[in-house]
Structure formats: structure tokens, C-alpha cells
Regions:
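Extended, low-polarity segments enriched in aliphatic/aromatic residues
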Residues: 1-208, 217
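Short pre-active-site segment immediately N-terminal to redox-active cysteine/selenocysteine motifs
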Residues: 210-211, 221
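Iron-sulfur cluster-binding cysteine motifs and their immediate structural context
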Residues: 217-238, 243
């Protein structure tokens, strides 16, 4: 049951000192990340470390995307999450992966034909990302995790046991090279236009007054919690400082 959450306090986070995980996390003897090798529209690649985002309950995921809308900040958040989870093992299912620009939900199935596992989640992701054609340094959450020097000091420390990449052969996999999001746009704009771009391209909820029956459900499920009823006649934004 992942409907309830509980707060975990931890040390060493770059952005967070506490994080809310699903209650079963606190009842488990160990954490194993069972991940599928996929492309990702925002992060380019998703694997063992990104998979731990599944420990976050329901709408809290959307809240974290809203809070850390910049991809660099979201990458740091993912590293904090992996650190807090203290996952002891990870298995990567790459028998059939997902490639193309639609990942992780609307990409295309691609036969890769291998399984991989490691006690070191970053080492596993670094290796698998390399095998399908990525430069892991270009994957923001992996490069951030490497910079922390918690899982690895240097990729050269990674030791492969079992089938070599050469024996598996050249894998046909369409990587994501251009990710979506405000951060991607910022690279093409002068600094003074960044704040304007954020206002234009960050999605914001709006009431549909003609369809509204004032049930209040949208207020309950709004990830940034910025909606409220103003009076008996109409609904509008509730001003809230962004964290």
C-alpha cells in the first residue's frame, strides 16, 4: 500500500535534509531497485537511480517536479533521493527496453537482450547508459551523483563480471539527445529572457468556470497547492510563494 507516507531524515543531501517516502519503505529489510532501461524526455535516460523516484507517493511526485522544475535541481533531488533510500542492490531489465523520444511512457520497445545487476546503483546506470550509446557525463543525475563521490570516485573503478559489452554486440538504441523542459530552452536564450521563458513555458493550472461545479477536487489534487475558492461567486488562484 503506497497511499501513506512517512518522513525520513538523512544527512548529506545537497537540496534536502528530509524526504517523504511511502510507508512500506520503513517496513522493509532492504531496498532493491528493479528498473527498466528506458529513454526519458526530461532526463534523457532512466534506470536504477531514477527508478527510486517510485518511493515517492502519488501526487508528491508532481509536487517535486514543480518544486525542482530546473533539470539540474531535479537531478540533485534524484541524487538526494538515492542517498536517502540507501538502496543495497539494483537489477536492470534490458531484455526489452524502451528507446526514442517518447520515453519513459510513450517510447518504442527495443530488444536489447541482457540483464544486469549491481550493489552500486551508479555503476550499474553508468555501464548500461554507456552500452546503449550515451555519454553518462551528459546525463545530469548521473554526473551529479558521480560528483558527490559517494558511489564512485571515478568510472574507471567499475568492474564488469560476466558477459562483456563486446560479447553482447552493438546495440541498436535511439538515445535522447535533446531533452524537454525550461533548462533546455535557457541554453538558447540570453540570461535576461530566462524569467520570461519560465512564465511562458511552465504549465500552470487554470479554472474552467463554465465547467466548475465547485466540488473542490482540483484544489485537493493540485501539486503546487496554489488553487483555492476566493468567494461564493468564483474561483481563482491563491497566491503562494514558491519554495
Amino acid at each position: 500500500d503506497f497511499s501513506e507516507m512517512q518522513t525520513l531524515h538523512f544527512e548529506g543531501g545537497a537540496l534536502l535534509k528530509s524526504i517523504d517516502f511511502a510507508k512500506p519503505f520503513f517496513e522493509a529489510d532492504l531496498v532493491v531497485s528493479l528498473s527498466k532501461l528506458k529513454t526519458h524526455q526530461l532526463m534523457a535516460y532512466t534506470g536504477a537511480m531514477k527508478n527510486l523516484f517510485g518511493l515517492v507517493v502519488g501526487l508528491n511526485k508532481a509536487q517535486m517536479h514543480y518544486r525542482f522544475y530546473d533539470k539540474k535541481d531535479f537531478s540533485k533531488y534524484l541524487t538526494d533521493l538515492a542517498l536517502a533510500s540507501a538502496s543495497q542492490y539494483a537489477i536492470m531489465d534490458a531484455i526489452v527496453g524502451m528507446d526514442g523520444p517518447g520515453g519513459p511512457g510513450n517510447g518504442d520497445p527495443v530488444s536489447l537482450g541482457f540483464l544486469a545487476g549491481s550493489q552500486n546503483l551508479l555503476a550499474l546506470d553508468w555501464t548500461c547508459a554507456s552500452m546503449v550509446g550515451y555519454n553518462p557525463y551528459d546525463i545530469l543525475n548521473l554526473s551529479d551523483a558521480l560528483s558527490r563521490k559517494i558511489w564512485l570516485e571515478d568510472p574507471s573503478e567499475i568492474e564488469l563480471v560476466g558477459e562483456s559489452q563486446q560479447s553482447i554486440g552493438q546495440l541498436k538504441f535511439r538515445i535522447v539527445t535533446e531533452t524537454r523542459g525550461v533548462t533546455s530552452l535557457q541554453k538558447m536564450l540570453p540570461g535576461w529572457m530566462n524569467s520570461i521563458a519560465k512564465k511562458i513555458f511552465i504549465k500552470t493550472p487554470q479554472f474552467q468556470h463554465k465547467a466548475c461545479i465547485r466540488c473542490g477536487r482540483c484544489i485537493e489534487i493540485c501539486p503546487p497547492q496554489v488553487l483555492n475558492f476566493q468567494d461564493e461567486q468564483k474561483s481563482k488562484w491563491k497566491k503562494k510563494d514558491k519554495e
